[in-house]
Amino acid sequence: ARKERSFSVVVLFEPRPAMVHGYAAKHDGQEPPVGMLDTQALTSVDERLRSINALGVDYTIIVRYTLEFAAKSYRFFLGQMVGKLGMRALVLGADAALGANRAGDVKAIENLALATGVFQLDVVDDHGPGETRVPANAKPVMPADHGEPADPLEGATKAERRAWSKKHQAKAVRVWSSTNVRYLLGQGRIKDADAILGHMHAVEGTVVHGEERGRTIGFPTANLSQDV
């Protein structure tokens, strides 16, 4: 942006698109209630804004993500970005997809950029040590023993990996991905998640009075309000 003598903008979608579509799929196409707690969010809006601000970004736009907005075409969205913000360059991840039915993938947007000549597309390459596999329907579990659980695939042979993947209907994801981080946190593998995040994972919230269970389980606990 500085080289182009322009300004930088980050666009955030809130709530998370996956949360909105996941709720709609389970509730006959209904929108999630305003303010509904997103238990799968890795960071709050405030945390993201602090991180973005630390990078020196000029402006951040928070778009309320709704099913009505999701039904817009990627051409409409990009048209708004060009027409109202004067967008000259768009930076996306390699697996990004915009617009209704995720039709605006990198290839489609690249073709549009070349055809119009209005903006250029910069694609950020994937980072991290390749791919891993996570269960398709992984759910959080309480570790059975003290300490953090080990990687179930560590030291496994190819045959053992295939058997594990088949048993858990595992899907391939990037090691450095939010999907993998959620899986690791849900399994209690906090250190592995922290290694990907580059910092300790934290949950922010207001501490409230609870049932004082920490007195009975041998270690202190803190109760957070639902407004996390």
Regions found by a protein language model. Name each.
Residues 75, 79-228:
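Active-site cores that bind ATP or allylic diphosphates and position pyrophosphate for catalysis
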Residues 1:
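Short, glycine-rich nucleotide/cofactor-binding loops
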Residues 4-12, 118:
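Short beta-strand/loop segments at the ligand-binding rim of alpha/beta enzyme cores
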Residues 10, 62, 123-124:
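A structural preference for short, hydrophobic beta-strand core positions in alpha/beta folds
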Residues 15-120, 135:
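N-terminal Rossmann-like or analogous alpha/beta NTP/dinucleotide-binding catalytic cores
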